[in-house]
Amino acid sequence: MEMSNAQRLILSNQYNLMSQLDPSNAAKYKRLQTIVERGYELQMRELNKDFGCITETECREIIDIMEMYHAMQESNKMLDDEERGKVDQRRLQFLGFDIATEAQQVHYVRFLVDSEGLYPQFDKADHHFNSQMPMLDKYRRMLKTWRNCPRQYHLCANELAQIFSA
């Protein structure tokens, strides 16, 4: 993150004020203030992590992934008991993304569910959409398979299995 000296001074003052307003997090704000004041470039990258950017294309891809899971869950509900028995029910749960490598995607999913109220049927589980393993490539393969299905919102057990194994 490139900042002018004036910007660094303003941010330093804000961290100083935050440390006074929020004593329980004072050590955190003092640390960030020191990083900004002294210009530690490596640590200043930490400041960037909260100011990510997801393109419109990436946002639409995440929504498509969530919509695919919604379609799979709804399709599963429409199956008769025999067909439903062939579907691994655990794989119908949307796990989210890996917070370590796909943080922006995790935050966007949380925004969609928590702030926008979309997909309330998705179980946040204990990890709140942190799959704890990279998922984006897997989801992309699943999306490709799902998009090739003729009836995307009325999938049979075989189609669900194909999507899961993509």
From Swiss-Prot:
It holds the Pfam family YfbU. HAMAP family: UPF0304 (MF_00762). Belongs to the UPF0304 family. This is UPF0304 protein VIBHAR_01542.
